[in-house]
Amino acid sequence: MEMYFKRMKDEWTGLVEQADPLIRAKAAEIALAHAHYLSIEFYRIVRIDPHAEEFLSNEQVERQLKSAMERWIINVLSAQVDDVERLIQIQHTVAEVHARIGIPVEIVEMGFRVLKKILYPVIFSSDYSAAEKLQVYHFSINSIDIAMEVMTRAFTFSDSSASKEDENYRIFSLLENAEEEKERQIASILSWEIDIIYKVLLDSDLGSSLPLSQADFGLWFNHKGRHYFSGIAEVGHISRLIQDFDGIFNQTMRNTRILNNRSLRVKFLLQIRNTVSQIITLLRELFEEVSRHEVGMDVLTKLLNRRFLPTIFKREIAHANRTGTPLSVLIIDVDKFKEINDTWGHNTGDEILRKVSFLSQKRLVKSKILGAGSSRKLAVS
């Protein structure tokens, strides 16, 4: 990514250096004179799109976005060589914000198209000569295109990182009590194994036993486990073990005489033992792999730490927009925390934080999310 930004800096610098200073001055003049009108017209057109409207409330547009758009137009069209590096950083920051709140890249691209469309008549209605108008337009469009490319590339990178964090949070939230889930599934497959062993040893018959894929463990693995652990190699190994043993199981069910033969019966029992043993080993490895996601948990309070706050807020904002419900965030600041630490020691301070976290969590309804914002702050969404 750094190499890309360096290349774009060179290209943007080259555009500014090669442009006639008079043309650059006229582009800056257009920007200063018309940025306010352009920002108003820009958001008027963009907000017609129903998809874009989801992200652009009237209050938000009036309070923040129009003035930000004005500054952006002036900065890009008035760029000097010394401004280029700062402008690239601005595009990167804007892209990160877009990715964090979930604005799709197609809306950003539509916005650039609208801006170039409304800029054209502004430039060509000026009193510049025809040649100057054309050069100002070319310089302005090329400047906007470079800014757009930098922003889009940074957006894609930020969106990819955000998606990974979304996936990490999904796994973390689904398997927050991973140890308990692991033991539950191990007990489930062992119970299935013991049930079959008893039937084979006592009756030489599988009776109404289900194949592994249809037993409780198999159903959990195929409908939940595969989804939770998608992308981890052990998932494929467990899937193949289940499939292979189901083949042996179904063959034995079709030919019950196999279990009347002692050597074949022993072979079948060894196969089930070997399969279950391998699956349990792989299952433990899966949960160990997932345990690394616990870096998303504050060690002291056992609450979500700041790592997942952008993911949580993005999800909550999307839900509030979709349902038209208000969204509030409560920040709880533990008062006199430094004084407590200095007077009674860090162990006492830690115990107070644990107590506050426990009581706060206990009093929250299940749909609310409590996270540790910093060493002394809790956030409730």
Swiss-Prot record:
- UniProt binding sites for substrate: 341, 350
GO cellular-component term (any): plasma membrane
Disulfide bonds, paired cysteine numbers: none
For this chain's record, the cofactor binding note is: Binds 1 heme group per subunit. Binds 1 Mg(2+) ion per subunit.
Q: Which PROSITE patterns match?
A: GGDEF
One Pfam family from the record: Protoglobin
Top-rank taxon of the source lineage equals Bacteria
Residues reported to bind heme: 98
Note the site residues: Involved in oxygen binding and important for the stability of the Fe(II)-O(2) complex.
43
Tell me the keywords, alphabetical order: GTP-binding, Heme, Iron, Magnesium, Metal-binding, Nucleotide-binding, Transferase
Q: Which GO terms describe its molecular function?
A: diguanylate cyclase activity; GTP binding; heme binding; metal ion binding; oxygen binding
- Site described as Critical for restricting water access to the heme distal side to avoid rapid autoxidation, located at 65
| One record GO biological process | negative regulation of bacterial-type flagellum-dependent cell motility
Q: Note the site residues: Important for oxygen binding and stability of the Fe(II)-O(2) complex.
A: 60
- What is the enzyme's class at the highest EC level? transferase
GGDEF domain residues: 325-381
Q: Which cofactor does it need?
A: heme; Mg(2+)
**Which parts of the sequence bind Mg(2+)?**
333
Catalytic activity, reaction form = 2 GTP = 3',3'-c-di-GMP + 2 diphosphate
Q: What is its EC number?
A: 2.7.7.65
Q: Which pathway?
A: Purine metabolism; 3',5'-cyclic di-GMP biosynthesis
Q: Which SMART domains match?
A: GGDEF
> From which residue to which does the signal peptide run?
none
Q: What is known of its domains?
A: Is composed of an N-terminal sensory globin-fold domain that binds heme and oxygen, and a C-terminal GGDEF diguanylate cyclase domain.
Known function: Globin-coupled heme-based oxygen sensor protein displaying diguanylate cyclase (DGC) activity in response to oxygen availability. Thus, catalyzes the synthesis of cyclic diguanylate (c-di-GMP) via the condensation of 2 GTP molecules. Cyclic-di-GMP is a second messenger which controls cell surface-associated traits in bacteria.
Q: What is this protein called?
A: Diguanylate cyclase DosC
Could you tell me which species this protein originates from? Shigella flexneri
Gene assigned in the entry: dosC
